[in-house]
């Protein structure tokens, strides 16, 4: 990853080295080049399970947050805001994504916080967690939508990045309606970068692509 020192914060690079992430996988390499280098493009990536899709979206979204917060005084009300929403199909995948994102944030944890809404906690605990405006929220679509409808998860003015991880599973598990509601009911900022990550590109995923993505880079790896 040292070849991407011009794109990634030194603290992120150090954490990658500590966690033995040496050479980027093809999907990570292509995503970094197209989402951070030059014009920040939307990404549609088809890559098999185990190909490194979490870091393929995780590194760009975390880098954008770190870069943004470096220019905001900690005393400002704009400093704490949810800037990335990661939608996943299951609690297990939420745990995996949260763990890997936190690994990358080893040296930035005083600056960037990740909240996992898929964990089975009381609603009062979840409300408190969201009231602190974590930088990244990882959730199933149903949990994210419920939190938005309750007014607890607010990203309309702050969202930089939207991710649907394992899109084919998100849709096959029946979350399609929740995803479309999140997209169409005014919960999101008008301008944000979107990552659709999937092991397969079936008709349902292609339909979601048309709804979500603007001039995307399509990676078939």
List each model region and its residues:
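Conserved nucleic-acid-binding Ia/Ib motif block in the N-terminal RecA-like helicase ATPase lobe
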Residues: 21, 70-150, 158-161
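N-terminal intrinsically disordered, low-complexity tails of helicases
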Residues: 1-42, 89, 107-111, 117-118, ...
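Phosphate-binding Walker
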Residues: 26, 54-59, 91, 207
């Amino acid at each position: 990853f040292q070849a991407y020192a011009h794109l990634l914060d030194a603290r992120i690079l150090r954490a990658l080295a500590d966690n033995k992430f040496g050479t980027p996988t093809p999907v990570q390499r292509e995503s970094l080049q197209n989402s951070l280098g030059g014009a920040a493009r939307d990404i549609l990536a088809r890559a098999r399970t185990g190909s490194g899709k979490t870091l393929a979206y995780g590194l760009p979204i975390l880098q954008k947050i770190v870069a943004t917060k470096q220019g905001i005084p900690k005393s400002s009300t704009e400093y704490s805001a949810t800037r990335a929403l990661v939608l996943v199909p299951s609690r297990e995948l939420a745990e995996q994504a949260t763990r890997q994102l936190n690994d990358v944030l080893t040296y930035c944890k005083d600056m960037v916080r990740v909240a996992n809404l898929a964990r089975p906690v009381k609603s009062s605990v979840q409300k408190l967690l969201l009231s602190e405006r974590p930088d990244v929220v990882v959730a199933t679509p149903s949990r994210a939508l419920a939190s938005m409808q309750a007014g607890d998860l607010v990203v309309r003015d702050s969202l930089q990045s939207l991710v649907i991880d394992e899109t084919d599973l998100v849709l096959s598990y029946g979350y399609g309606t929740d995803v479309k509601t999140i997209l169409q009911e005014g919960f999101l900022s008008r301008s944000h970068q979107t990552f659709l990550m999937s092991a397969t590109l079936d008709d349902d995923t292609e339909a979601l692509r048309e709804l979500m993505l603007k001039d995307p880079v399509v990676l078939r790896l």
